[in-house]
Structures are given as C-alpha cells and as structure tokens.
C-alpha cells in the first residue's frame, strides 16, 4: 500500500487499546489460551496494517500512537519492526507499571524528538495503586499522556474512587506543563455530565460514536482531552478489518482476539481513536 500524495499540513495521533497484547513467551499470563508465536506475530502485523491503513486514509502516518494493554518491549518491537510498518521508522517509549497483570501503556512516535518521558503511578490515600501508570512523554512542541484507568466492570467502589483520583492527577500534570498537552487513553468510563477540570477540556467526538460495544450499547470510553482543544478533530476508526457481525444484538462490533479461552483472530475489543489538528 502506498501513502497518498495529497497535501497534509496537520498532525495525526492515534490511541488504541490492543486487548491483552502479551509476548507469546509469557506463558503464565495466557496459560490455556494457546497463544502461539504465529498468533502473536499475526496480531503484531495486523496492528501495523491498521496504522498503515490510517496513514493511507489521512495522507500521513500517525506521528504518535498511544497503546494500552502492552506487556513488554518485545511486543512493541514486533509491531514497529513488522514488514508493514518498519519503513516508517517508529520508535517507542515504555515503562513497566504497577499493574498486577503486567499490562502497561506505551507510545510509538516518528519524525519527532522526545525531550523527556516518565511513568507516573496512580496514588490513592497516599499509596501507589496496583494499576497501569500514566505515561508522560514530552516532545519539542507537544506533550502527551497515555492512560488506562482502573476498570469499572464488576461495580467495584474502590476502583471507582481510584479512577476518580486519576482525573485531578491528570489535571495537575496539565497545570504544570508549558506545552500543549494531549491526554489520550482508555478511561474505562464515558465522560460524566458536568465533569469539569481546571486545565483540561474534553475533545468531543461525533454524537452517537463509540469505541467499544458492551451488551449491545456503544460506549465512548476511549477519550481525548487537551489543554487546548482548538482545531482538534476526534473520530473513531471503525474499519472493516476490525469488525464482525454482532449476532446477539445486531449491527457490528469490534472483532476481539479472544472470547474467554476461544481464539477469534481479531485485534481488539476496542476501535482506535484518531485525533487530527
């Protein structure tokens, strides 16, 4: 696939939760699921093909790609060095987090220089939360935070409090950042009515848009916030290659990698979100 030559003067960023993307050698994490080398490299190449398709559509390969549910640098290398993506020269930033399952946030980047980066653990009542750390990466003219906040599934009151605590942490980071800050990630809940922060504003997607489908309902839990939302356009990349027919609720839904122990061969239960400005 060749990148089109149409004029493009903006910046493209992507965030994608790639659903439990573990190195196939991490046997203890995916025991019983037959997560083989073939399936691992097929998924890595599939992620690369999606980024290539977005590059073709936008006329420019994404400058920054935030990823959630990545387990190690080996997984990131499999993505950026795959035959479909290697020509773009992506590099990556990754830190081991405090998540008990070993899944972290990561960031791919190209054609830009990292000034500084760090992992910022979530804290609650003075203690580090056993969850994914916030990933802060600063470039010459832009700063990015990639996040994957505690899950809401199961109705855990503690998880809800931890998730709520993350919002002022993100706002505090924004308040001390001298550059335009983009926060992208899986917030594990939709924006709450009346939710306001001092330094960050929500980038609104099109109405009726969702990045996941849960019990037949579309939810926009993969979100973007910024210290300056002017000119930022946000869309969900609903690609045919990422979808399957929803036999239970009708319509379509993301084609995930596994449903329980059953291998489906998809890439994720989330669609990527794309930001342009």
PLM region spans:
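Active-site beta-strand/loop signature of hydrolases that rely on acidic residues for catalysis
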Residues: 13-18, 51-77, 108, 144, ...
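Active-site His/acidic residue clusters
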Residues: 28-32, 142-159
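Active-site environment of divalent metal-dependent phosphoester hydrolases
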Residues: 72-74, 100-102, 152-153, 188-194, ...
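Active-site-proximal beta-strand elements of phosphoester/diester hydrolases
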Residues: 12-22, 118-119, 141-151
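N-terminal, active-site-proximal structural segment of metallo-dependent hydrolase catalytic domains
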Residues: 2-83, 87, 93-99, 103, ...
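Structured beta-strand-rich core segments of catalytic domains in phosphoester-bond hydrolases
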Residues: 70-141, 149
């Amino acid at each position: 696939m060749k990148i089109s030559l149409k004029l493009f003067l903006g910046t493209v960023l992507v965030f994608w939760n790639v659903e439990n993307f573990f190195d196939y050698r991490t046997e203890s994490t995916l025991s019983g699921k037959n997560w083989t080398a073939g399936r691992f490299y097929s998924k890595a190449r599939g992620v690369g093909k999606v980024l290539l398709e977005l590059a073709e559509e936008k006329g420019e390969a994404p400058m920054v790609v935030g990823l959630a549910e990545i387990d190690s640098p080996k997984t990131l290398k499999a993505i950026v060095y795959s035959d479909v993506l290697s020509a773009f020269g992506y590099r990556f930033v990754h830190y081991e987090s405090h998540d008990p399952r070993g899944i972290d946030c990561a960031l791919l980047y190209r054609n830009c220089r990292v000034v500084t980066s760090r992992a910022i653990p979530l804290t609650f009542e003075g203690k580090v939360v056993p969850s994914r750390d916030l990933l802060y990466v600063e470039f010459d003219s832009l700063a990015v935070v990639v996040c994957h906040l505690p899950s809401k599934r199961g109705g855990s009151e503690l998880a809800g409090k931890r998730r709520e605590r993350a919002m002022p942490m993100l706002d505090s980071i924004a308040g001390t950042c001298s550059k335009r800050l983009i926060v992208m990630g899986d917030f594990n809940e939709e924006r709450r009515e009346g939710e306001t922060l001092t330094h960050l504003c929500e980038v609104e997607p099109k109405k009726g848009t969702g990045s996941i489908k849960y019990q037949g309902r579309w939810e926009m839990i993969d979100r973007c916030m910024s210290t300056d939302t002017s000119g930022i356009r946000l869309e969900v990349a609903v690609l045919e290659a990422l979808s399957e027919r929803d036999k239970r609720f009708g319509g379509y839904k993301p084609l995930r990698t596994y449903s329980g122990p059953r291998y489906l061969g998809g890439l994720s239960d989330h669609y990527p979100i794309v930001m342009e400005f």
